[in-house]
Amino acid sequence: MNLLRTAAWVAAILTVCFLSPASAAEPKKPLTRYWVSVATHNMAIPGMSQGEMSGLQGMILGKVAGVGPKKTLLLQLGAPGNPPASPEAAHDIPPGMEMGKSLPLLIPEREKPVRGEEPQEGKPEKPKVRMLFYWGCGETVGPGQPRVLDTGKMSMADFGRAMAGRTGSVQAPPSPRAGWAYAEWPNRRDQKEVPRSSSLVGGHFVHGNFSPDIKFSVDERHDFMAPVEFTSVKGGLADSIAFEWKKIPTATGYFAMAIGHSEKTGETILWSSSDAQEPGYGLMGYLPPADVSRFIREKVVMGPEVTRCAIPRGIFKDAGGAALQFIGYGDELNIAWPPKPKDPKIPHEYVWAVKLRNKSTGMLPLGQEGMREERTTKEKPPAGDKPESPAEKMKKTLDTIRGLF
């Protein structure tokens, strides 16, 4: 089983493991909800120039891509009641976003049902996966490691529970459902990219003909987070890989995980930065500040003052490729209207609520410390052979590890 099939299979198991009855619970009150999901992503490759990075991103994305961090935004509006025949909604934005005066919020078109494939006869074959799991920042492997997860020696349910690990509080953003109007951005009409210099700071106004007016302001603490910037990466796949990063001013904590695949044994190697035994699959997305604080106390998430970590020596020595996934958790902005009256005897009911959540993520291919030397070598390739560029070599590595996270 190749690495991508293994990753897809593990992801399917985790999807089931992370489901909980609370995720399907209906809100007690018909409250209009508006979620703003903010993210900054940065891919870093030690030793590569901006020109090579641009070429690599172009190969990966199939188009010419700019170098540097990428900002993304997801807007989701959910209002009680069925939408009118001609629904309209928009989010008026501050000038600092540099994206015009407003962003249209559209109701998604219903997808036509796809005729299912003919069911296959017989019982599906149980996937064969053997995973070596390590944890903790440090130059050497900790005691009792690795933990071996083998589907040949454990049930699928036990494997799923072992891989699920910790998760944050259930987050259920607005989504299409019966009896509710749902609109979103980006959408089929507007899919513009968020400029690198875009800022959310300022006043925001959400309005439409199927939801109440929503007005709120965003301050600097809840603006786009600074990108993940690795300031130092030392060590090859056979070594202890030490990495440092620039502190993100608005981060509430950090978490890192790395994954690779042994070419010798076919085993998947997984590592996380947690001091406690924690795979980390459930921690690579948005987390509320209360969850981040709890995980810091449990020594699972690194505190906001931490700026360095190390992967133990030799755990990826037989890997054909490995990658580090990194996340900085951001603060949340939660606003509800109208405000509660001081007198508790006065009846009160919220009309709308806004949640703005934030994260900054980074991806770092590991074991590329020799790329600079390869670029500066004077050895000429055999006649007739076109030398493989560092970007092409890196693309092969990324093709192996894409989809893991």
Region annotations inferred by a language model:
Residues 8-18:
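Bacterial N-terminal signal peptides
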Residues 30-187:
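Solvent-exposed N-terminal domain segments of exported/luminal and surface proteins
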Residues 239-243:
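Structural beta-strand segments of beta-rich domains
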Residues 249-252, 262-405:
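Hydrophilic extracytoplasmic domains
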Residues 190-214, 319-333:
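Short, aromatic- and glycine-rich surface loops/edge beta-strands on solvent-exposed regions
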Residues 22-27:
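Boundary at the C-terminal end of the N-terminal hydrophobic targeting segment
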Residues 213-225:
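Proline/serine/threonine-rich low-complexity linkers at boundaries of modular beta-sandwich domains
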Residues 254-256:
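Short beta-strand elements bearing conserved aromatic residues within extracellular beta-rich modules
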